Swiss-Prot record:
Species annotation: Xanthomonas campestris pv. campestris (strain ATCC 33913 / DSM 3586 / NCPPB 528 / LMG 568 / P 25)
Keyword Coiled coil belongs to the record: yes
Coiled-coil annotated residue ranges, if any: 45-72
Name of the protein this chain belongs to: Transcription elongation factor GreA
Role this protein plays: Necessary for efficient RNA polymerase transcription elongation past template-encoded arresting sites. The arresting sites in DNA have the property of trapping a certain fraction of elongating RNA polymerases that pass through, resulting in locked ternary complexes. Cleavage of the nascent transcript by cleavage factors such as GreA or GreB allows the resumption of elongation from the new 3'terminus. GreA releases sequences of 2 to 3 nucleotides.
Phylogenetic placement of the source organism: Bacteria, Pseudomonadati, Pseudomonadota, Gammaproteobacteria, Lysobacterales
Gene3D superfamilies cross-referenced by the UniProt entry: Transcription elongation factor, GreA/GreB, C-terminal domain, Transcription elongation factor, GreA/GreB, N-terminal domain
Covalent S-S links between cysteines: none
InterPro entries xref list: GreA/GreB_C_sf, TF_GreA/GreB_CS, Tscrpt_elong_fac_GreA, Tscrpt_elong_fac_GreA/B, Tscrpt_elong_fac_GreA/B_C, Tscrpt_elong_fac_GreA/B_fam, Tscrpt_elong_fac_GreA/B_N, Tscrpt_elong_fac_GreA/B_N_sf
Keyword DNA-binding attached: yes
Protein family: Belongs to the GreA/GreB family.
Length: 158
C-alpha cells in the first residue's frame, strides 16, 4: 500500500537522503580508514564507533529509500477541495472555550511533526477533521478531556 505524502515532505526526505549519501557516508568511510590505520582493531574504540555510525547511516539510507519508493506524492496545490478538509489541508482551529487559535497541516504519517504543526492523517485530530468545512465545529477527545474547536479556515498551501 502506498503511503500519502505531500511534495514538501518528500522533498525533505530526499534532502536528508542526499545529505546522508553525499556528506555523512563519505565522512564515516574516511573515519573508518583513519581508525584502521591506528592498528589493532580489537581494542580500537574509534574504529568500532565509526563502524557503528556507518551501520546507522546505511540503515537510515535504506529506510528513506523504502519510504520514498512506497510514497504516493500528492501535490496539494492541485486539490480542488475548496473549504472541505482533506489530506494536505492547512486548518486553523479556534478553541471554543478560550478562543485560542491553532494551525495544523494534515500530512502523511512519515512526515508528521507536531512541533511544526504537521499532523498525521491517521491521528485522532486529523480523522476528526477530515470532511469538515469552514465554520464547522469538531469535538476532539484529548488526554485532558473533550475539547471543542471551530474550523476557522481551510487552505491548500505548498
Amino acid at each position: 500500500m502506498r503511503a500519502p505524502m505531500t511534495s514538501k515532505g518528500a522533498q525533505r526526505l530526499r534532502e536528508e537522503l542526499d545529505h546522508l549519501k553525499s556528506v555523512k557516508r563519505p565522512a564515516v568511510i574516511t573515519a573508518i580508514a583513519e581508525a584502521r590505520a591506528h592498528g589493532d582493531l580489537k581494542e580500537n574504540a574509534e574504529y568500532h564507533a565509526a563502524r557503528e555510525q556507518q551501520s546507522f547511516i546505511e540503515g537510515r539510507i535504506k529506510q528513506l529509500e523504502g519510504e520514498l519508493s512506497h510514497a504516493e506524492i500528492i501535490d496539494i496545490t492541485k486539490l480542488a477541495a475548496g473549504t472541505k478538509i482533506v489530506f494536505g489541508a492547512t486548518v486553523t482551529l479556534a478553541d471554543t472555550e478560550t478562543d485560542e487559535e491553532k494551525r495544523y497541516q494534515i500530512v502523511g504519517d512519515l512526515e508528521a511533526d507536531i512541533k511544526l504543526g504537521l499532523i498525521a492523517i491517521s491521528s485522532p485530530l486529523a480523522r476528526a477533521l477530515i470532511g469538515k468545512l469552514e465554520g464547522d465545529s469538531v469535538t476532539i477527545d484529548a488526554p485532558a478531556g473533550q475539547r471543542e474547536y471551530e474550523v476557522v479556515s481551510v487552505a491548500y498551501l505548498d
